[in-house]
Amino acid sequence: MAARLATVACALFLLSSALLRLGCRARFAAEPDSDEDGEETVAFPESPPQKPTVFVVVLARNAAHTLPYFLGCLERLDYPKSRMAIWAATDHNVDNTTEILREWLKSVQRLYHYVEWRPMNEPESYPDEIGPKHWPNSRFSHVMKLRQAALRTAREKWSDYILFIDVDNFLTNPQTLNLMIVENKTIVAPMLESRGLYSNFWCGITPQGFYKRTPDYLQIREWKRMGCFPVPMVHSTFLIDLRKEASDKLAFYPPHQDYTWTFDDIIVFAFSSRQAGIQMYLCNKEHYGYLPIPLKPHQTLQEDVENLIHVQIEAMIDHPPMEPSQFVSVVPKYPDKMGFDEIFMINLKRRKDRRDRMLRTLYEQEIEVKIVEAVDGKALNTSQLKAWNIEMLPGYRDPYSSRPLTRGEIGCFLSHFSVWKEVIDRELEKTLVIEDDVRFEHQFKRKLMKLMEDIDKAQLDWELIYIGRKRMQVKEPEKAVPNVVNLVEADYSYWTLGYAISLEGAQKLVGADPFGKMLPVDEFLPIMYNKHPVAEYKEYYESRDLKAFSAEPLLIYPTHYTGQPGYLSDTETSTIWDNETVATDWDRTHSWKSRKQGHIRSTAKNTEALPPPTSLDTVPSRDEL
């Protein structure tokens, strides 16, 4: 009996335990947990991981002109500054690079996780260099040692990534760092743009370690192929993932024991990467930023300043302007008129974007202009045209689409005509006229001032000088002007992008009384210097002795051509001159006139107008295509 009771008791215990367990499960499944006071306990979701840490290396020498904009781009990277460290070094300066970098570091050190500052005030130059842009072996060695010290510090700090970026590289895309990290490569670089084909990568390398031209380079550089590509060399700006095991084998200095190539920091590092079994990658999926073309060893810091200016103004064609860091002082600019009595910039009031870009572009070049509010062809009506006695030149037809004159072209003509009138009224001896859709050649200001100085010295009798046009005489060379390099006698041309005009030239153009026999202004000018190919048009203008010349090579070009993104024409997208109900929109298919300059035969290229090459021109610049 006792044994049976014990068995029953044991069974009841086991059953109650099972029921308790089932009850607990049911309760947890059906009811939220609560504390002793009856309050519910909620399970919070896990937070995302923090961004990887990035160790940024800044090596600066004679960079007072680039630093404000470089640092501004660095500040605007969309990445938590608390997850970034700055390792900055500067040496061998003849400008105030040290002061600018110190000013910035003091202002931002509280924002970044870690800041290390390594200035060296003396000496100002390397004993074996010929100028501040020269790279003797002593400079290569010093830079490689600095990069190695930075790499060692990044490893000691357990940084996830290290970003090397030259101080004349401008990451204008704020997402660049995030985009490179996402690629998950040991070494990866964003493709940077320059005014030429130069960039921060090689697609080919010879067995001796020299640059090798390949078809792939152009395909990648011009975005004909887009993606992230394996390449033998990236330089100037690149990201290294220090979490990857193979990265432990990377070194900048000393060179690998098997290294026999040229003593150059970027080639030494590419060899190190190869020996470590690490593939370098170059990405061109987006536009990331800009870099200048390297100068030759004999070139000066002033030329480097001009390099920066050109990078800035080229970037503004399709993107917002580069702004300097808010934490450093910027040297003020002092615009002038380059020796002209006046510089006019013609702009439609409704094209504020063009006006703003041009004003900033001209300011960066220290050029002072007066804005001329253009006559808007869209606002012209028949009554106004009659009041001004405007009639189209009989028989005129556009050379490509065979359409008559448009009101947009009339507005353009009247805009230029108003400038000529002001030149006469104010008795301006030497005037420059530019339109609002131009891009400037490298060293524009220096080259134009030198050209005008040479013209004055030669006492050339001139009345019009094109600085931007579309040359239509492509089979034979235009005649070079004796004693003035970079100047030719102008032949038939399209476009009025920019030109210098004298008082006598303005008087001849206004005196031709063109309102009653009007055609586009860029067709009118060749008639006035007797180079228009259509004889019938010339018959309506008796005096055709305008003394017209052109810069060779040209100094300005259109920002966009027909068919390119951003191309816009206010002259062709308009209405017929005498019938505002007939629209003219030939831009997309018929506007050959607005297309890029066609091929000029080698026999037509004017070498007589160019200065002879010097021995310095043959000195190769570092890493130049």
Swiss-Prot record:
It comes from the Eukaryota. CDD domains: Glyco_tranf_GTA_type, Glyco_transf_25. Residues 1-26 form the signal peptide. Residues 597-625 are annotated as: Disordered. GO terms for molecular function: procollagen galactosyltransferase activity. Gene3D superfamilies: Spore Coat Polysaccharide Biosynthesis Protein SpsA, Chain A. One of its GO terms (cellular component) is endoplasmic reticulum lumen. The keyword Repeat does not apply. It holds the Pfam family Glyco_tranf_2_4. This is Procollagen galactosyltransferase 2. It comes from Mus musculus (Mouse).
